[in-house]
Amino acid sequence: MKKMKKAVYLILFSVLTANSQVMENPNTIMSLAPVEQLALTQEWDKVFPKSDKVDHRKVTFVNRYGITLAADMYTPKDAAGKLPAIAVSGPFGAVKEQSSGLYAQQLAERGFITIAFDPSFTGESGGRPRRVASPDINTEDFSAAVDFLSVLPDVDSSRIGVLGICGWGGIAIQTAINDPRIKATVASTMYDMTRVAANGYFDTDNSAEKRNAARASLAAQRTEDYRNGSYKRAGGVVDPLPTDAPQFVKDYHAYYKTPRGYHPRSGNSTDGWNVTSILPLMNFRFFEYAGELENAVMILHGEKAHSRYFGEDTFKLLCGDNKELLIVDGASHCDLYDNLDKIPMDRIAQFFSKRMPAE
């Protein structure tokens, strides 16, 4: 009898121990990653004035890769009931204190709950090393913002949209292709970052020879980075400005390198991306399934924007009668960063309201 009891105890102990080992084994954890406690600036440090028509607070959420993202949330004052919501990000290399925050605040004034978030590895968000770009992780960032908004008690989860500016305009559309929870998408003054990375501006470097030369240079830089134990930075917007700089480079300088848009956490304002961040963008192509995007899209560009061809070519890939292309008379690429006389904010709000109607 004693031997039988001992055997039962041994079996029970082994089962409990096995369960304990499974529970403590990090390779078997299936729950969401914990939200990292980020050091968030509490004072108003945006490049635009604070509105008295909305409430503002900092929020954090985690993406599917376990990276904690930081965002500014803007809510209409005296909001009642469940409201439609919009996640905003961009431009590429910028932070939420710049253009994306301005858009988010403006749309909150028009009745939406909005968040402007810093992408992974950028600004106040988590992720190491800093200033790394990834077409996969960055599209995931937008979907993670939708995750977060979907479970807020004040948000109508059937009425969530996204808005991307500059390089994040292309990322917004790419995310919407894969995430049907996004009912409406606006891409403002958009870039296709995969196209410009692989082909250069205006497709002037679109050849196997030039891409292979770029790959060889970047691969060599990887070796140097690993040897040095740190990543070489690409540099932000050029400064001082060469006298023969193209007009669009002058426009970037006028935004990122002056009090108008400079922010110390913005890579475009300071020392830029890691040089090798361009590699995954060269090896990836957005919009392969653009024709399958059923939900609504608005692409808007300035008439004079150097980036206009990205938006017009992407628009041709979209199908359905819920897609819109809006060209803003007389506007440049950077006018749609912060020039409220040029940005058709009411048209954008009307688009979201029309394409995300209350049920």
Indicate where each model-derived feature is located.
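Short beta-strand element of the alpha/beta-hydrolase
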Residues: G81-P91
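Conserved alpha/beta-hydrolase
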Residues: Q106-G126
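Short beta-strand/loop motif that positions the catalytic acidic residue
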Residues: L293, I299-H301
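Alpha/beta-hydrolase active-site loop
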Residues: V132-P153
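Catalytic histidine-centered segment of alpha/beta-hydrolase-like enzymes
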Residues: A331-K342
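The serine-hydrolase catalytic nucleophile loop
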Residues: G93-Q105, P119, G311
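Alpha/beta-hydrolase-fold enzymes
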Residues: I173-K257
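N-terminal cap/lid segment of alpha/beta-hydrolase-fold proteins
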Residues: A33-G81, Y337
